[in-house]
Amino acid sequence: MLSFGSALLFVLAAIVVVAARLFFSKPQVAPRQPPPPQLSSTKISSQPLPATWYGSEKIHELERRAIFSKKWILLTHKIRLPESGAYIRYEEAGFNFFLIRNNEGIVRGFHNICRHRAFPVVTKDNGTAKILSCKYHGWSYGFNGQLAKAPEYQNLKGFDKKKNGLFPLHVHVDERGFVWVNMDAKVKPEVSWASDFTGVDRLARHEPFNLDDYKFDHTSQEDIDYNWKTLADKYSSNSKIEQLFTGEESEKSSRIISDFYFPNAAMTFSPHFFIMMRCNPVGPARSSVEYEVFRHKDASDEDFNQVQDIIKRASEENKSLPNPSEKNFNTGILVNEAPLYFQSQVRQLLEHHSGLEELAKKEIRPAQQVLDQTSEQDESLFSSCSGLSCGKLAKELAW
């Protein structure tokens, strides 16, 4: 028989058990998670961007994640890719990639990284290839990015060629033949081309210019020692490039139109040529201005030579632009709505992406490729044969 004390302890224990069961049987309400930040309206802010945003490494990296990894970038025209195997290499905000026309006539884009040792697959600025071949260990790829040959590795147990193709980019060729890319690694990019640019390839003011009458002529590049947004501020007003035509040239080129395409591209059409320009971020305080020039089939040398004068004047203007990181740059209010609209878009995209990262408690890199489990296993196979240390493979591929 239990003593009185033992019986009391038994009763108390039973009460605790029953109370615990009642408590834990109640539905538990999960803590409410704050909603993800939403992009604000496109209303133009009256305040310019802070001067520190034009020289900060932190802002530069955030722009790579929030803008250049998510937005559509205007690159070139399909005129430059006239046949199967024709390719062009690009670098945009630190991303190295290339465009290539496949055997079906479709323009594809890929990160310029071999899946074996990250050596560049394309080493020339442009050309025509029969196959995409990495010169490091002989891996080769078809024009659709699929792995065609991986010496020795393709015979390893568990190696899946289908999982080791080149990392693709999203490519859109619009109705006028202009080529756009999006770095977002998702199967479907977060930002669709149509959401940003519907109708830009159907503008009535572009109709006088038949692009079938133009051919690619040359590229030009200029390195400058300030932030890419300084240039985009300038060119976001469509009239800026048009103003480079003065005097006699203006009379000869009465039909000249210019357009800016966020975040960093501009285009100018004339009856004699058209120019595509990009402000490419190289670093927080360094940029590259890159031109692609196309010539009309009927343009005389005299008319076409205007291009060099225009680029020369643009270069002189670029060198004279104020440096936004200088003291007192943003003490006043900018009154030109074009730069303010551009800056408002930059501000909204950076603040929105920063909010997402704060919620996730980590950096979000939309362009970063995510390997599935099979690909991760393949990567471990590569690491087991480091460098040229795999006997027979070393002798075969050590060129």
What are these regions (language model features)?
Residues 34-39, 143, 201-204, 251:
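Short, flexible segments with low predicted structural confidence
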Residues 81-185, 191:
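Rieske [2Fe-2S] iron-sulfur-binding domain
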